[in-house]
Amino acid sequence: MQLQKILNPFVVVGVILILSACKNDSPTPPNEAPKGAGDFSIKNGDITITGTLDLPSTPGPYPVMIFIPGSGRETREADKPAQSVLLPQGIALFRYDKRGLGQSTGAYQNVNLQNSAQLIPERASDVLAIVNFLATHQDLNPKQIFLWGTSQGAWVAPLVANQSNQVAFIICVNGGGSSVGIEIYYDGLADNASLSISQLTAMLANYTGAPGYDPAAALQALNVPALWLYGGMDRSNPTFYDIAQLEKIKQERNKDLTILLFANMNHDLIDVNTGQFDPEFFPKIIAWSKSKLGK
């Protein structure tokens, strides 16, 4: 099932930059703004979310990207390869253990049709706590905090942006435009390998089940720039259904929303013809991000 699948394009690239930056191993004293790279524990009510802040070697203050992972039991170590993409561009990275995993407290639950309307907002509340924390960090620019939501994380990112005036923009990859119910239905249909992407997309009109979490309201309310990236050969998430929903909202609500389609890319961001990662994927994201950061 798509909801049990982890998608991390930074892992696909497979390049890990080893940092020599000084780590913040000692806890921050009370009432003192956090500073430096390293591990931080962030409170969200009774829950503690633990993550790592990676900083560039150039002088700050820095913009910072919060990586919101997809589904599955993913901890921050899976997102470490993002360092090699962001840090050379002067962009800091915050990666974290999901609630109930790694060093984060609470109970971990897989998202499904029945619990998604509760768990997606719950995960957004954890990210919102991270945003609020990073806005106080001495080495970061509080006006240049942005979110990367991949797969399931693409449902989370708009919710966070709508609840904070600290989020500058969001980037979403292979997800976030359709309801949980539609995505699960599509994923199940796609088990039939004889059906084409266009046939699978057309069959979504037959879905009459429960929606589960539906992102429509969050997308309509979104008021920050957003970049969506999709693979045209994705058999886990309904790319063309998603794009149709996003285009409709863009036109009706006059949103600053950019959609990039990589025609031969699958859910794992691999070109199905070449078996390789698209070399234009990250350069296009960096260029768009820098345009929003004014760099």
Predicted regions, residues:
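N-terminal cap/lid segment of alpha/beta-hydrolase-fold proteins
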Residues: 27-58
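Conserved alpha/beta-hydrolase
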Residues: 86-107
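Alpha/beta-hydrolase active-site loop
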Residues: 115-138
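Primarily recognizes the serine-hydrolase "nucleophile elbow" in alpha/beta-hydrolase
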Residues: 133-187
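Short beta-strand/loop motif that positions the catalytic acidic residue
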Residues: 222, 228-230
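Conserved alpha/beta-hydrolase "acid-adjacent" motif
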Residues: 235-242
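Catalytic active-site module of serine/aspartate enzymes centered on a nucleophile-bearing elbow/loop
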Residues: 265-268, 273-295
